Amino acid sequence: MPRKGPAPKRPLVVDPVYGSPTVTQLVNRVLVDGKKSTAERIVYGALEGVRDKTQGDPATVLKRALDNVRPSLEVKSRRVGGTTYQVPVDVRPSRATALAMRWLVDYSRVRREKTMTERLMNEILDASNGLGAAVKRREDTHKMAESNKAFAHYRW
């Protein structure tokens, strides 16, 4: 444990195109091997595709998609007397957003469309409509927390 305490959160640079820190976070999530311009091209292309398909503001659609994917509960392992319990815990808002973005990007990577831009665009559209693998992951996480509610008293 460091004696100085936790490192302070650095301010996030606001996205130049949409003026949204959420889009910047998404670009950083898509980033592979430090190729930021490629990641920006993928994300901006996906958001342009969202604009074309919905005739609406892509930042709003992205926000709705993240709201549909963001978990409120998750399970953490807790060892008690030789047995490991899956204890349901509330998710901090910053972690919930990070998980939602991670799931959106991860499940868009395994989709079957040809380019990453198309895959990300379709996953965002599906998530904004309450469909898709990322939303299913959130439902599975909530179901796991619900089924282990009996162990909630082991919370720390």
Curated annotation (Swiss-Prot):
Protein keywords: Ribonucleoprotein, Ribosomal protein, RNA-binding, rRNA-binding, tRNA-binding
Key word tRNA-binding present in the record? yes
SUPFAM superfamilies xrefs: Ribosomal protein S7 (SSF47973)
Task: List cellular component terms (GO).
Answer: small ribosomal subunit
Which GO terms are recorded in the biological process aspect for this UniProt protein?
A: translation
Keyword rRNA-binding set for record? yes
Record PROSITE patterns: RIBOSOMAL_S7 (PS00052)
- Paired cysteines (S-S): none
A Gene Ontology MF term for this entry?
Answer: structural constituent of ribosome
Which InterPro entries does the entry mention?
Ribosomal_uS7, Ribosomal_uS7_bac/org-type, Ribosomal_uS7_CS, Ribosomal_uS7_dom, Ribosomal_uS7_dom_sf
The record describes its quaternary structure and partners as: Part of the 30S ribosomal subunit. Contacts proteins S9 and S11.
Annotated family: Belongs to the universal ribosomal protein uS7 family.
- Name this polypeptide is given: Small ribosomal subunit protein uS7
